Amino acid sequence: MNHDSKITPIMQQYMMLKSQYKEYLLFYRLGDFYELFFDDAIETSRILNIVLTKKGNVPMCGVPFHSSESYLNRLVKLGYKIAICEQLETSEEAKKRGYKALVKRDVVRIVTPGTILEDSLLEAKENNYLSCIVNVDHNYAIAWLELSTGLFYYHTTELHKLDSDLFRINPKEVLISDKLVELDSIYSILRKYKFSVTQYSGSFFDVSRSYNTLCNVYGISTLKGLGDLKNEEIAVCGSLLEYVKATQKGNLPQLEFPKAYSKGDFMFIDAAALRNLELFCTQSGDLEGSLISSIDYTITACGGRLLKRCLSAPLACSHAINRRLDIVEFFVNDRTLCRGVRETLRGIADIERILTRIKVGKCSPKDLYALKLTLDKIFVLLDLLHKFDSSVVGDFCSRLGKYDDLCKTLDDVLIPNNVNNVKDGGFINPDYDAQLSEYIYIQSYSNDLIQELRDKYRNITNIQSLKILYNNILGYYVEVSSSYLISDKDFIHRQTLANSIRYTTSELKALESKIISARDAAINLEVKIFGQLCTCIIEVADKITMTAHAIAEIDMLTSFAELAIQYSYTKPIVDDSYEFNIKKGRHPVVERNGKFVANDIDLSLMQRVHLITGPNMAGKSTFLRQNALIGILAHIGSFVPAQHAHIGVIDKVFSRVGASDNIASGHSTFMVEMTETAAIINQATDKSFVILDEIGRGTGTYDGLSIAWSVIEQIHNVNKSRAIFATHYHELSKLDRYLENIKCFCMKVEEWNGKVVFLHEIIPGSTNKSYGIHVAKLAGFPQSVLDRAEDLMSKLKANEDLLT
């Protein structure tokens, strides 16, 4: 049965819009609230723990418009996508179209995890990437962009590399075709990382459509200026833009042209290494204890994001690396300047994201004032840096730029404010505009103006009891006693009462109109001036973007200097050799916990593979990880925790450390181990750095030993990578007898009065002692279990029957 006749016009409008956005929660604007109805209301009230009510048989709930961002934040973090429906006109404007006309409403934007622009919904030091994966003619490509900063990258990839790509990029949302999701390998990756996934049919990723989208968005007639793009690269970039257009309803921020992520320019760190080395979080998912938590001394939001990007993709070009190292050295050598620069950076706003909000019309007066304060700080930075005749600071000075005219305009126009909504007014300097000054004067002194006019009329009429009063019917009016009659033609009779006569004048009506409309007029004028300011800023947007990038780099590199100063890091020698020579190296995270034993390593060509034997708890895994981390730190342009470091450029870092089941993929610990090891021997080159811990331990002794042996041979003879291999298989130490570039080391252990002391020191040689029972004792095993283990071990060594 058709119930449309029983549904109110507002609900008809809602249901029409909801039918177009079935997969989204529809935030429907009604006055000062966003309302949700039916299943949306039931779901949202449950998630947000807000009151669910009913109007008739319609479930409903709502959130206040002015505090909606906090609710959006909670929903988006849980992976929900929200369609924002706004009122496109006022009720007064609707009435002009007809007495019963419904206020026009429409969805103006779709909020998804990867398309957030609101500052309150974004993590300051994290990029909020939206990513896309396509397959065109069996060729894969991946692209990722950030709406809030305009960053846009792409590159071709392979199916087996998608895990590493997605771990490195860490997008908040992934756009993908439904057919690709059906592939077990891709489904398991998406499930493992729990990205928000948006699926479309294959036609959405059409190459021709994507080509046209790219041309339309960037206002170009051909893509030749972007380079020789492959079909899969066109599809992945164009599809990403098409999705952004859909979510932003055509109101696109100014995105950078998509840049090819050149794999040769950056170190490749596979997904296993990213996890095992705990670059961004520990194995348990905590930030505390990760590498970035130990080295992040950045002050600004853009500096923090740059550090994270650099750590996920370290440089692989010695010239670029040494440029950064030279800048860090410059600031280390001038600590006064370093401190001055870092102090100036405090309070600098996130102008990358502010600029994007300005471009899409979502900025606030608070944003503009923050931009003004930041541009003021640029002058201070320039004053500090101009004192030094150095090519290092000269480059920064030119990139920071000067904003004399813009700063003067912002100074003249804005007053200090914390206004989040432009329609609240009160942020434009009244002295900037004579008309605005008049409106504000009228608002502030309306009573005084009425009294001034009253006194004027008393003098004109010579009636000292004359009053100017107000009511909702007449508005402002002049009232005199009925014993007086005003003959002045300027006074127009309005009303005669028993004891009084009421008049008005054109002057009084004009003042009334000014008083009543002054606030609205002032706000409208402030909005207009605000728009003009935004236009001025957009005209120099590219320059401000360059400034933001310079601030981010200055912040990151001075933070490296601060790190080096505080923890006695040294400048590494980075060149195109095959060296990896570290003196007194330390683990950048573990050393913070207290006393740390520094160790040397020399993986030069003649001993490029090191085999480490020794018991658990002796420090093998820490030693492996610390050297990989030292290599990565050097490649992001940081000084390193060592007394000396000489490192030839590393193209790839691989790690097989730790044991874990991948239950989601149905893989056992041993299968995970073998898969990760296979990735290493299939991809590592002579410029790669490999750490392997206990290969083969997840299977039988003979199987495990055989696999470990053959893997070492492969890495030594074929891959020829710099590698550190830790093992319990002491038999492997025989390899140095016939593999010329392998060298054996062990963890130094001292035994004294029946006790074992792990010295955490690397020494030449090998050992066949595992001290497993001692470790069990440290773990808290009961003495009876330890005694029984000692007895059984004695029998095993004597080849005795364990059952006797």
Curated annotation (Swiss-Prot):
Gene3D superfamilies: 1.10.1420.10, DNA repair protein MutS, domain I, MutS, connector domain, P-loop containing nucleotide triphosphate hydrolases. GO terms for biological process: mismatch repair. It holds the Pfam family MutS_III. ATP binds at G614, P615, N616, M617, A618, G619, K620, S621. InterPro entries: DNA_mismatch_repair_MutS, DNA_mismatch_repair_MutS-lik_N, DNA_mismatch_repair_MutS/MSH, DNA_mismatch_repair_MutS_C, DNA_mismatch_repair_MutS_clamp, DNA_mismatch_repair_MutS_core, DNA_mismatch_repair_MutS_N, DNA_mismatch_repair_MutS_sf. The keyword DNA repair applies. This protein is involved in the repair of mismatches in DNA. It is possible that it carries out the mismatch recognition step. This protein has a weak ATPase activity. Belongs to the DNA mismatch repair MutS family. This is DNA mismatch repair protein MutS. It comes from Ehrlichia chaffeensis (strain ATCC CRL-10679 / Arkansas).
